[in-house]
Regions:
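Conserved active-site tyrosine of GNAT-family acetyltransferases
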Residues: 23-24, 93, 117
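Short hydrophobic/aromatic beta-strand micro-patches
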Residues: 10-12, 80-82
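Conserved Rossmann-like nucleotide-cofactor binding loop
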Residues: 84, 118
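N-terminal first-folded block
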Residues: 18-19, 24-32
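Vicinal oxygen chelate
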Residues: 2-6, 29-78, 90-113, 125-128
Length: 128
C-alpha cells in the first residue's frame, strides 16, 4: 500500500502571480503561500479540490496543442475543470483572461488557454 498522495499541480509561467490570480478568480480558490516567484492556491477550507502552484520561469515557452511539428513546445499536461453551464463558464473564463483554443474536440468540452498559454478544458457531464 502506498502512502503517496497527489497534493499539488505546479504550472510554470512568465509571471506566477498573474497566472495564480487568473485561477483564483476562475476557481474561487484562495492564496495559501505567496513568495516572489512562487504562489500556492487552493480551495477554501472544507471545500474539495487540488491545490495549484505557479512558478515564475524566465525561459518559459507557451505550449502548442495539438502539435505534430518537431521543435514546438508540447503540452505537458492540462487541467480538466467540471462546470454546470459550459457556455456561461466559458464566457466567464474569457472575461478573466482565457482565450478559446482553435482545437475543440467535443460538444461537451471547451478547450481554452490560460493567460500563460496552458491549455485547460471546461466540461459538463454528458447527458444521455
Amino acid at each position: 500500500m502506498s502512502s503517496a498522495r497527489l497534493s499539488t499541480v505546479v504550472l510554470d509561467a512568465h509571471d506566477a502571480h498573474e497566472l495564480a490570480g487568473f485561477y483564483v478568480r476562475l476557481l474561487g480558490y484562495e492564496v495559501r503561500a505567496d513568495e516572489p516567484d512562487w504562489v500556492l492556491i487552493g480551495p477554501p477550507p472544507g471545500q474539495p479540490g487540488t491545490a495549484l502552484a505557479f512558478e515564475t520561469e524566465g525561459a518559459y515557452t507557451e505550449p502548442v496543442w495539438p502539435t505534430r511539428r518537431s521543435g514546438d513546445q508540447q503540452m505537458m499536461l492540462h487541467l480538466d475543470i467540471e462546470v454546470d453551464d459550459l457556455d456561461a463558464e466559458t464566457a466567464r473564463a474569457v472575461a478573466e483572461g482565457a482565450r478559446i483554443a482553435e482545437y475543440q474536440p467535443q460538444d461537451d468540452v471547451r478547450v481554452l488557454l490560460d493567460p500563460s498559454g496552458h491549455p485547460f478544458c471546461l466540461w459538463v457531464e454528458a447527458t444521455p
